[in-house]
Amino acid sequence: MVMMIIIYTEPEISLFPLQDRSEELSSNVENGSCNSNEGINPETSSHWIENVVKVRKPYTVTKQREKWSEEEHDRFLEAIKLYGRGWRQIQEHIGTKTAVQIRSHAQKFFSKMAQEADSRSEGSVKAIVIPPPRPKRKPAHPYPRKSPVPYTQSPPPNLSAMEKGTKSPTSVLSSFGSEDQNNYTTSKQPFKDDSDIGSTPISSITLFGKIVLVAEESHKPSSYNDDDLKQMTCQENHYSGMLVDTNLSLGVWETFCTGSNAFGSVTEASENLEKSAEPISSSWKRLSSLEKQGSCNPVNASGFRPYKRCLSEREVTSSLTLVASDEKKSQRARIC
């Protein structure tokens, strides 16, 4: 007895009919069966077309327009008449819309009114006055500014006139500060009252880019300290001694032969002095007499000079230095 076993298998449902159909078509082409009627049923073809079409996702509107009701629009018009463009106050008046929504609605409403202004008749609709735009707020401090510095003391009129003539900038420093900074230019001497300064003629000197007032005194200053006078005389005596020593060591007559002036310091001092003409002229007469006595031949140039001639030259140089010191004392300027 033969037992026959029949295995029944269910047909597999393919999830991708398009792929299966393409495989069948390719197998038919390979076998040579190009007939369109073979293996194609009208029922299966319609089912295949339906599966091919993809379903689009529904379009979700993320931002919906806020619709204004008639009541809200009427409140909006009332608030515009009351508050103009005060959006916060209009928001409180309406109660259901935000300030941003009210401002956008007003912009659309105003543009619509401007377009319909020509076609609209005056009697049909009441004219709504569009409020003018609010002025922009100016910043209280747009950029930092320097506060004006109050001047403690006004500059004298003579200084301003001289600065206009010289085209130099005015100094912001006070008079006391300038005195402290320029102490090295002034000598340690007691100053007189302001009345004496005003009576004396004043001249200006530009010193390191600053204008300095100098009071010229016609008469010799009477008030000097004894210590200052002693220091000045000591310095002058030391300077005169150094000058005589250099003249003796180098030889004045040799320099006269070469054409250089050994008494250059004496001549510079004599050029600067104007008031003491008589003593300087007498001293120069003595020097000229000494020059006439000496000759420029090499015999006189070499060797030492007589003792009497050296003494006379020392007297001349000492007298010149004393005259120069007296003139310096008389021409001392007051710098303020």
Swiss-Prot record:
Transmembrane region(s): none
Single annotated GO MF: DNA binding
Biased composition (Basic residues): 134-144
Compositionally skewed regions (Pro residues) per UniProt: 145-158
Swiss-Prot/TrEMBL keywords: DNA-binding, Nucleus, Transcription, Transcription regulation
DNA-binding region extent: 87-110
Region of interest (Disordered), ranges: 114-197
Protein function: Probable transcription factor.
PANTHER family, per the entry: PROTEIN REVEILLE 7-RELATED (PTHR12802:SF164), SWI/SNF COMPLEX-RELATED (PTHR12802)
UniProt-recorded name of the protein: Protein REVEILLE 7-like
Organism: Arabidopsis thaliana
